[in-house]
Design a protein with these regions (language model features):
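Long, low-complexity N-terminal extensions
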Residues: 1-225
């Protein structure tokens, strides 16, 4: 499971530290890893608490939490086969659970689940590009996702006319994938390939825009017509 934030850096570090404590506490009590949804719920409540009192200020971040939850039915009392059918109390035997999870948590503590999310500078451009991918269909492979994520980041930076930047990426696969369900940095060779793809795609978009501009009639031509 991984987390990223935009906004005040110290607040982001505290958010990650608290998330680690919540995950550790969950494992101590329930003897199983915390799910992405439960961690988002707990962290949303934690951020919301800082909006209730005048003695503390709200968090100055928007955070994204992503993870891959086990799809196996763990034989833990209160987790499988018994307990309520909804909420944190348990699962229903035979029903499928787990898989990928992605949540964005706002400073108010409000959080939502997404197929793809973006925050920070350039988020509107990134969101527009994410919508083009039809992530809900679930047809994007892990390697394709890395390439598209790199492309979107390059597009967002180019739109804002940002200076040169260093791209860092992490990923999470299922238990059969390259990360075995763990949150890890994308290997250097795959990251370099993704950056080449992103730069090539960006150059292609620039060429298309230049071609469209060349096809447009000049103002003088329009007046003569």
């Amino acid at each position: 499971m991984g987390a990223v934030s935009s906004g005040l850096v110290p607040d982001g570090r505290h958010f990650v530290s608290r998330a680690r404590d919540e995950a550790s506490s969950w494992r101590d009590v329930y003897k199983t890893p915390i799910t992405t949804a439960d961690l988002a719920s707990r962290m949303g409540g934690y951020l919301q608490a800082y909006t209730l009192y005048s003695s503390v200020r709200p968090f100055g971040i928007t955070a994204i939490i992503g993870g891959w939850d086990s799809e196996e039915e763990l034989p833990v009392d209160g987790q499988v086969g018994s307990g309520p059918s909804i909420g944190s109390g348990g699962k229903v035997e035979g029903k499928k659970y787990g898989g990928p999870g992605l949540y964005m948590i706002e400073p108010s503590g409000l959080y939502w689940g997404y197929y793809g999310a973006a925050t920070g500078k350039g988020r509107q451009v990134a969101k527009a590009e994410l919508e083009k991918l039809d992530l809900a269909a679930g047809n994007l492979s892990l390697l394709e996702g890395v390439k598209e994520a790199a492309r979107i980041i390059y597009v967002a930076h180019d739109d804002n006319k940002d200076k040169d930047f260093e791209l860092e990426m992490t990923w999470i696969s299922n238990l059969e994938g390259p990360t075995k369900g763990r949150h890890q940095e994308v290997p250097k060779d795959i990251l370099e390939e993704a950056e080449k793809y992103a730069k090539k795609a960006l150059e292609g978009e620039d060429d298309e825009e230049e071609a469209k501009d060349d096809d447009k009639p000049a103002e003088g031509d329009r007046m003569e017509e």
